[in-house]
Amino acid sequence: YDDVAIGINICEDIWIEDGPADLQVKAGASLIVNINASPFDINKTNSRRKQVMEKAKKLNVPIIYLNMVGGQDELVFDGGSFVVDSSGEIIFQASQFQEEVFSFDLDVQVKDIVSDSKLTLNIKKDKIPELQSHKTFDELESMYEALKLGVADYVQKNNFHKVLVGLSGGIDSALTATIAVDALGSD
């Protein structure tokens, strides 16, 4: 797009020292897009961000980190996609635990492409609405949001029209009922 070479890699490609992202930048990529389906883990959010920030700074290119959101079987994907500029600073943070579409303007330094072949895409440039970054959740909020999303997606993807919650009256039952209501509604 306007002579900007974009390196696209998948999941763990971004973590590999001298891996695909490094090779893409050496070949002339001015922007890296990393596509993920990284499951939720209470300790993963900060680790992801730190590693991508360090990689962007090292390579001196912006990185768009896209992560899947939703429940799938026993896994919950927390989303939380983000954009890091070439200095390693997060300039946009998407919501966690909910689907979202976002667009943004991003300044990139056009580099010479060091490759014999390239794919050129012509993209129509429309006026882009202003974005609002979203907060990330603390550990307790993250766990609760993951539970809600997992329950809601499981019920929706299995096309259940009703659910039955068995309660014994203890604190675990209170939490189960609260998660069910927050995820599915009180009906």
Can you name each region flagged by the protein language model?
Residues 99-146:
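Catalytic P-loop NTP-binding/switch module of NTPases
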Residues 8, 83, 101-105:
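Conserved hydrophobic/aromatic beta-strand scaffold that supports enzyme active sites
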Residues 1-8:
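Beta-strand-turn-beta hairpins that frame and shape the catalytic cleft
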Residues 8, 14-15:
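Internal active-site segments that recognize and position negatively charged phosphoryl groups
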Residues 57, 61, 86-89, 93, ...:
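Generic secondary-structure signature for well-ordered alpha-helical cores
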Residues 15-99:
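CN hydrolase (nitrilase-like) catalytic-core segments centered on the catalytic cysteine
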Residues 13, 137-187:
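ATP-dependent adenylation/nucleotidyltransferase module used to activate substrates
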Residues 9, 34-35, 64-66, 84, ...:
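Generic beta-strand/beta-sheet core signal
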